[in-house]
């Protein structure tokens, strides 16, 4: 279901700033359920995402930050309930800005976590159900960013500390 899309170069906001949703897996043992990649991509595309071919299993671009967060939460929730694989859990990162920054945010997440950056919090007016986790300098070309843990994916949220490099 992945369709090719070329991420804009850093600083190119010709289409306006994009919100990226990046998804990888935390695998502990032998996955028991089906691979959730196509399932997750269908959910994101239904929410208006453009899928981007990448080494990471799922990378999506949204024009609307609210839609990006909503569909990241839906993808997490539905995967937990409909696939229910205790050995393969989604790690989700959401960032409004550059794709490489979104990937860095995702790499801070553990399985069953949706982590988002301060740009997402600002763009949504601080209205998301979340708790602040860390002020981290996860990319070298800017100031530290506040990382937030979405609490909308309860009851299966993972409260472990983030994977800050």
Which residue stretches match the model-derived regions?
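Catalytic beta-strand-to-alpha-helix segment of the class III nucleotidyl cyclase homology domain
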Residues: 60-164
